[in-house]
Swiss-Prot record:
Protein name: Polypeptide N-acetylgalactosaminyltransferase 13
Cytoplasmic side: 1-4
CDD domains: beta-trefoil_Ricin_GALNT13, pp-GalNAc-T
Upper classification of the organism: Eukaryota, Metazoa, Chordata, Craniata, Vertebrata
SMART domains referenced in this protein's UniProt entry, alphabetically: RICIN
Domain free text: There are two conserved domains in the glycosyltransferase region: the N-terminal domain (domain A, also called GT1 motif), which is probably involved in manganese coordination and substrate binding and the C-terminal domain (domain B, also called Gal/GalNAc-T motif), which is probably involved in catalytic reaction and UDP-Gal binding.
Gene Ontology biological process terms from the UniProt entry: protein O-linked glycosylation; protein O-linked glycosylation via serine; protein O-linked glycosylation via threonine
Transmembrane portions of the chain: 5-27
Main location: Golgi
Residues binding Mn(2+): D208, H210, H343
Topology versus the membrane: Single-pass type II membrane protein
Compartment(s): Golgi apparatus membrane
Length: 556
């Protein structure tokens, strides 16, 4: 029996080394130019081959399911970082991941002489397992000759294991890992600036502290910067479940935009961008904005373009500020579809903001609007009137930067880079739509696409009660338009399609009526059955069918 077990072990070991030999033979047959000094992608690829034989929780990106007996403990641990800490701690720090790249990406060959990079990771009270899994994924899946260093910036963490224990641990890793300590809680923006200032690489790559890099993630980013140093590049951001840590591939068919409130949003890649790439999905996507957590930028260009706005606090808005600045000042922003990095997306943040989240984000957004949005800032202020009340500090240095860089106006950005923007360039009215009879206002109620528009007491605080009556005669709330598909309604909010039809409304500035062209009915007050939604009725000229549109300029 023992002899049989021994034979099986020998056979299994032999098979594994045969596979390694075959891999090496195939690799070097394609790599005549490789030298010993530059390992190219050999070690990361070899690690990936070996990792496919690993078994254990979360391997190959599979979900980790916690037994029922441990559910209560799991829920308590979840509160610490707002993700399933129990699941994360069960997963190996160097777990294997699936290769989620497009097939065309797997055969791409990149230049030998690529710039190297410093990877800057900011953390604050991060979990040990997610932080170290981020670091390991960078080291194990990056050619070391391209990896100048990993810089961990501790934004005043309070947990003991992130002090001396972490310092001693990173000394054992294969590449230089430097830890920088912020003296006080400074936020992502200032911590990244500190890390960038200490970096030595030709390129700076910023990552969040709960990421996992996949095979071949780095070379496509650096190759694109080598082609054009003024191109700022982002990987496709894959989703790591905050509940199970399952690894799910992100889409190469989405890119970054923003809504009326200047919140970053993902939108489908438009047909014009597909046409520009001639249908080749392995080519980079030009994106109007970036999510901001994960990107690479030439270190000198980072300085030339103005780094981050140091007047912004913590985080929020800095990604749009940098996106506008890059495009308006002669650079470009791309999603490199052959690069994949996973990110733990949390439903809530475990951190508190000095002054509150709303105050911080309002200040940051006010700064970016004042410097970069020109006359379109007034549109944003109507949507978010609370922003105007915030002390946003001195932006004269940033305005001087814009002048020195000879940056283009925001209208150029909307017309040339983001023509699909939800901001209407021409509109007759922007603000509340108030019913004369009830003195109530249309309200989107925070509802989503394919739900009914509501009506509520007017509050004068913008937000959900801001509608635009556009030059195309749509009634818009952000990227949704009021749509009526049948007689007597209901009035539904659907994606604006710009094809008129069910979304065409005629406003009579004398009678104050909003007539739906297709049904020939008028928007009316709510019925007794549901006092929270407007109705569609035959036009009668009654006060209940009269609506006051704020700042109405019909005919301009």
């Amino acid at each position: 029996m023992r002899r049989l077990v021994y034979c099986k072990v020998v056979l299994a070991t032999s098979l594994m080394w045969v596979l390694v030999d075959v891999f090496l033979l195939l690799y070097f047959s394609e790599c005549n130019k490789c030298d010993d000094k530059k390992e190219r992608s050999l070690l990361p690829a070899l690690r990936a081959v070996i990792s496919r034989n690993q078994e254990g929780p979360g391997e190959m990106g599979k979900a980790v399911l916690i037994p029922k007996d441990d559910q209560e403990k799991m829920k308590e641990l979840f509160k610490i970082n707002q993700f399933n800490l129990m699941a994360s701690d069960l997963i190996a720090l160097n777990r294997s991941l699936p290769d989620v790249r497009l097939e065309g990406c797997k055969t791409k060959v990149y230049p030998d002489e690529l710039p190297n990079t410093s990877v800057v990771i900011v953390f604050h009270n991060e979990a040990w397992s997610t932080l170290l899994r981020t670091v390991y994924s960078v080291i194990n899946r990056s050619p070391h000759y391209l990896l100048s260093e990993v810089i961990l910036v501790d934004d005043a963490s309070e947990r003991d294991f992130l002090k001396l224990t972490l310092e001693n641990y990173v000394k054992t890793l294969e590449v230089p890992v430097k830890i920088i300590r912020m003296e006080e809680r400074s936020g992502l923006i200032r911590a990244r600036l500190r890390g960038a200032a200490a970096s030595k690489g030709q390129v700076i790559t910023f990552l969040d502290a709960h990421c996992e890099c996949t095979l071949g993630w780095l070379e496509p980013l650096l190759a694109r910067i080598k082609e054009d140093r003024k191109t700022v590049v982002c990987p496709i951001i894959d989703v790591i479940s905050d509940d199970t840590f399952e690894y799910m591939a992100g889409s190469d068919m989405t890119y970054g935009g923003f809504n009326w409130k200047l919140n970053f949003r993902w939108y489908p890649v438009p047909q014009r961008e597909m046409d520009r790439r001639k249908g080749d999905r392995t080519l980079p996507v030009r994106t109007p904005t970036m999510a901001g957590g994960l990107f690479s930028i030439d270190r000198n260009y980072f300085e030339e373009i103005g780094t981050y706005d140091a007047g912004m606090d913590i985080w929020g808005g800095e990604n749009l500020e940098m996106s506008f600045r890059i495009w308006q000042c002669g650079g470009s922003l791309e999603i490199v579809t052959c690069s994949h990095v996973g990110h733990v997306f949390r439903k809530a943040t475990p951190y508190t903001f000095p002054g509150g989240t709303g105050h911080v984000i309002n200040k940051n957004n006010r700064r970016l609007a004042e410097v970069w949005m020109d006359e379109f800032k007034d549109f944003f202020y109507i949507i978010s009137p609370g922003v105007v009340k915030v002390d946003y500090g001195d932006v004269s240095v940033r305005k001087t930067l814009r002048e020195n860089l000879k940056c283009k106006p925001f209208s150029w950005y909307l017309e040339n880079i983001y023509p699909d923007s939800q901001i209407p360039r021409r509109y007759y009215s922007l603000g509340e739509i108030r019913n004369v009879e009830t003195n109530q206002c249309l309200d989107n109620m925070g509802r989503k696409e394919n739900e009914k528009v509501g009506i509520f007491n007017c509050h004068g605080m913008g937000g959900n009660q801001v509608f635009s009556y556009t030059a195309d005669k749509e009634i818009r709330t952000d990227d949704l338009c009021l749509d009526v598909s049948r007689l007597s309604g209901p009035v539904i909010m659907l994606k604006c399609h710009h094809m008129r039809g069910n979304q065409l409304w005629e406003y009579d500035a004398e009678r104050l009526t909003l007539r739906h062209a297709n049904s020939n009915q008028c928007l009316d007050e709510p019925s007794e059955e549901d006092k929270m939604v407007p109705t569609m009725q035959d036009c009668s000229g009654s006060r209940s069918q009269q609506w006051l549109l704020r700042n109405m300029t019909l005919g301009t």
